[in-house]
């Protein structure tokens, strides 16, 4: 897969209350172009927003790309690079035999990541990393904007609990 566009993506999720109003922030960089995306939900969790951010970022890419995706979420990074293989083998159950939380988003992230060559990177949050700080601001602003959009996956997950 050579000759692919090289894209840098930075993502973050935020939740006020956890669960509570939440949002995600994304910074995409291609050559000298930068695009920012953010959205909020009325009731969700921090982990769901940390997962939704890379999903949305990867879904906006129109063609397969070589991606460096940087996040401050160990949950997302370890999940997609390590844990997901066992979950899929076990029918989306954890090593303890429990249903994987946020399975709707894990499945989406798994599917959309198949289109791209991705280098999943972690950066310490709130440590002065320019793009991560910008994503954090975007995510927090989206959560604070009194979003009315429903996170149907979270609502369905709560109904089944």
UniProtKB/Swiss-Prot annotation:
Enzyme class, first EC level, given as a word: hydrolase
InterPro entries: RNase_H, RNaseH-like_sf, RNaseH_domain, RNaseH_sf, RNaseHI
GO terms for cellular component: cytoplasm
Protein name as catalogued: Ribonuclease H
The UniProt record lists the keyword Magnesium: yes
Quaternary structure and interacting proteins, as annotated: Monomer.
Limits of the RNase H type-1 domain: 3-144
Organism: Shewanella halifaxensis (strain HAW-EB4)
């Amino acid at each position: 897969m050579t000759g692919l566009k090289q894209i840098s993506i930075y993502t973050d999720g935020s939740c006020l209350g956890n669960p509570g109003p939440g949002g995600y922030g994304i910074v995409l960089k291609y050559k000298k172009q930068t695009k920012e995306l953010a959205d909020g939900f009325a009731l969700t969790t921090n982990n769901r927003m940390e997962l939704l951010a890379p999903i949305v970022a990867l879904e906006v890419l129109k063609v397969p790309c070589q991606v460096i995706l940087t996040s401050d979420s160990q949950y997302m990074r370890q999940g997609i690079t390590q844990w997901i293989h066992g979950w899929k083998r076990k029918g989306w159950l954890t090593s303890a035999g429990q249903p994987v939380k946020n399975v709707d988003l894990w499945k989406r992230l798994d599917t959309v990541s198949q289109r791209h060559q991705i280098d999943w990177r972690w950066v310490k949050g709130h440590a002065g990393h320019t793009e991560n700080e910008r994503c954090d601001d975007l995510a927090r602003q989206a959560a604070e904007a009194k979003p009315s959009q429903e996170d149907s996956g979270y609502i369905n997950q709560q109904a089944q609990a």
